[in-house]
């Protein structure tokens, strides 16, 4: 009898507790493109999302607000560029023809802008700070018609042995004079204006601040002077030698037309040359850290 009565009470409670839930089923909203300054949480592939060598073009890597270490930072968004041509041929003022992805050229310029304005160099050194990578929308975003490309700055090419995550930001690095160590270019040595990069937080002899293709008629004296000017500005120190502890140097090389081997010095027949602007200790000691933005701080010796 008690069991039957309990069952009736439970059934009546269930019958009278008919709650009505107001609303309609739906799906979570799909976000739009990430804002400038968001961080890259996935490591890019060896071709940095530009599709070279059979790699994915504009992969959907994770981009999110910055917390902790990251692989890169969003420097700009190119709206509607997902379906744009990836191969355009152009000819420069010297008559040289290039074929490449125009989105990559735009991203490279946006990377430079994100780093801050560089000083006008009388020689035109290209600073080795950062690399451009490309990230595209997710599958859901593409289905809904989103066709943007996120331009991302990374410390180096995805295939580089020096490519690593970092903390802090490179936004306006050239303006404020502060740079996360993975973005600097260090090497154990420089041979005929070429070098093999190593992480700057490891012991090294050389920090390379710029590379260039000297114009015909360029002089070594002018090259050396402009290198000093560049390093003085990037180190934020009127005396980049730190009273003689360091030496500012340039290296120039060209390809020998007879042997095809790289040879020190300017080309004598008008062929292209290449140059490197770097700094090294005046003694046999090694560096352990970047000199970028060093200012009045002591040299980071090993």
Describe the predicted segments one by one.
Residues 1-14:
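Hydrophobic membrane-insertion alpha-helices, especially the h-region
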